[in-house]
Amino acid sequence: GKNYSASIIGIDNNTDIAVLKIITDNKLNSIEIADSENIKVGDRVLAIGNPYGIGISVSNGIISATGRDYGNPYLQLIQTDAAINPGNSGGALINENGNLVGINSKIFSKTGAYQGIGFAIPSNLIVQIVSELIQYGKIRTTWIGNFRVVRIRVNLNNKIVNALKVIEIDNFGPLYEKGVRENDIILEINEEEGTWGNLTKSLRFAGLGNDIQ
């Protein structure tokens, strides 16, 4: 490998993703980024990393699940059974075409070693984070008021769907000013299902002053 000098453009502590500017006159090749919305359970993937510092290696697996929050609803992680061990964090999760579908992030383990459950940050979220860091040097936060919701399932046109019920809301802030009140039910958020994950994702990357539908 080669060593390069670099400067830090921005860091997102929530995902442990940073944008670096590499200082070089050489032409650098970039990886193709896949649309993580198109991945399916069962798709084959490869996890690249440096487990335990022994050197760059690749492990083989499949997409086990998508939309896992694993304690952080902002992330909606990809779950994979490709071996991810300490040292793999920050490595690429690629599909069979060699395109980036995620960045290896963490594992579920009672021993600290690989037990078949690993997680990666999806590529679409990475693009959002990187774009924000390049433009602003940080992830800007948004606020729509103080409120509490509970997850519910409702029958909508003979179809059971996920939704959020507002159980408490302060009488100030953007959400209240738009007419949201206690016992209101949120069915969709920006044309996506009314789930806590979609709500927090919309809040995280809504531009300041932009509307959330």
Question: What role is predicted for each listed range?
Answer:
Residues 1-162, 167-172, 176-178, 189, ...:
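Serine-dependent protease modules
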Residues 183-186:
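Conserved catalytic motifs of ABC-family nucleotide-binding domains
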Residues 211-213:
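Short, conserved beta-strand segments of beta-strand-rich sandwich/propeller modules, principally
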